[in-house]
Swiss-Prot record:
Protein name: Protein trichome birefringence-like 42
Localization (cell): Membrane
Organism: Arabidopsis thaliana (Mouse-ear cress)
Keywords assigned by UniProt, alphabetized: Membrane, Signal-anchor, Transmembrane, Transmembrane helix
Membrane topology, from the record: Single-pass type II membrane protein
Gene expressing this chain: TBL42
Alphabetical list of PANTHER family matching this protein: PROTEIN TRICHOME BIREFRINGENCE-LIKE 42, PROTEIN TRICHOME BIREFRINGENCE-LIKE 9-RELATED
Superkingdom of origin organism: Eukaryota
Length: 359
């Protein structure tokens, strides 16, 4: 092989290597353009063991709710992907995500369902570059995943109500529905994904407050959905007054349903425990989620753009996706609120990725 042939071969290898990302990017962009033709939140779950899951214990050492690790015997829940009706969405491309958001800060703010989604995205990104150095730090307040090579940080700030929960010497813990005093922690991110709903329905020992307060009025109890609406409106006003849409893109993580009432899918007295397939059919047979309408109403009245990750209806179908007794707490805990990983939150992040491609 002479010099010119060697030079040509090296150039060919370089161009093929360079085009690799271009091909992926083109396919990703085509997928986004296709996705704009329909409502990506309407569709069905398709069993696909050729492409899902996107990661596993070997490619994500910090999974957390790894139900396989904790003894879940079935595996079908790992292989469902979301398919919108009438269009396709781009497959999640971790390298493309990291390249697009190089040097950026992504922030999840909310409860344990936000944490579920944060860990999912961190795993999806880590699996894309498994040999890259990373940091994964869990703290009571702010937890962070970073990949220094890309300068990206994906953060989770625990805040179950978004509004203030304060301690009072005489009354205990007061949930101040019209007050946000630590919103400065939410500033400075390029993408912010907020969530609250899960904690508002808690009762008994699970309830983390003693009183509600609005203005000077303090009450022991009130309608929970009314309290939720007041708090969410407080959050919406804070966003309208403090966020610059040219610097920060804001999303609201839609209400994540629980599956404690088997009567909703034809199994009275049962829960998510033992469920191995999604609900079949075009819609969930149970009653509408109370929080979903409130979220859409509040966001619809906002001055600043907030994009709703409208995942409630699609997630209602996944009665099979919860940890149940495979969350690490043994048979005493039947968790029908959170989600196994890999699993449903990966689809949420795929839809987040699809939405982010619009810029």
């Amino acid at each position: 092989m002479n010099f010119h042939q060697v030079l040509f071969l090296l150039l060919l290898i370089f161009l093929v290597d360079l085009s690799d990302y271009g091909v992926l990017a083109d396919k990703t962009n085509d997928g986004y353009k296709n996705a704009t033709k329909c409502n990506i939140y309407q569709g069905r779950w398709i069993y696909d063991n050729s492409s899902n899951p996107l990661y596993g214990t070997s490619t994500c050492p910090f999974i957390g709710l790894d139900c396989q690790k904790f003894g879940r015997p079935d595996k079908n829940y790992l292989h469902y992907r979301w398919q919108p009706t009438g269009c396709d969405i781009p497959r999640f491309n971790g390298r493309d995500f990291l390249t697009r958001f190089k040097g950026k800060k992504i922030l999840f703010v909310g409860d344990s369902l936000s944490n579920n989604m944060w860990v999912s995205l961190s795993c999806m990104l880590h699996a894309a570059v498994p040999n890259a150095k990373y940091t994964f730090q869990l703290n009571k307040g702010l937890s962070t995943f970073t990949i220094p090579e890309y300068g990206i940080s994906v953060n989770f700030l625990k805040n179950g109500f978004l509004v203030d929960l304060v301690s009072d010497k005489t009354r205990g813990l007061i949930l101040k529905l019209d007050s946000i005093s630590r919103g400065n922690q939410w500033l400075g991110s390029d993408v912010a994904i907020f969530n609250t709903f899960h904690w508002w329905s808690h009762t008994g020992r699970a309830k983390t407050w003693d009183y509600f307060q609005t203005g000077d009025k303090i009450v022991k109890e009130m309608n929970r959905m009314e309290a939720f609406k007041i708090a969410l409106t407080t959050w919406s006003k804070w966003i309208d007054h403090n966020i610059d849409p040219s610097k920060t893109r804001v999303f609201y993580q839609g209400v994540s349903p629980v599956h404690l009432n088997g009567g909703e899918w034809g199994k009275p007295g049962k829960t998510c425990l033992g469920e191995t397939v999604p609900v079949q059919g075009p819609s969930y047979p149970g009653r509408p989620n109370e929080g979903e309408a409130i979220v859409k109403s509040v966001i619809g009245r906002m001055a600043k753009p907030v994009e709703l990750l409208d995942v409630t209806a699609m997630t209602e179908m996944r009665k099979d996706g919860h940890p149940s007794i495979y969350a690490g707490g043994g048979d005493r805990l039947n968790d029908c609120s959170h989600w196994c990983l890999p699993g449903v939150p990966d689809a949420w992040n795929q839809l987040l990725y699809t939405a982010l491609l619009s810029h």
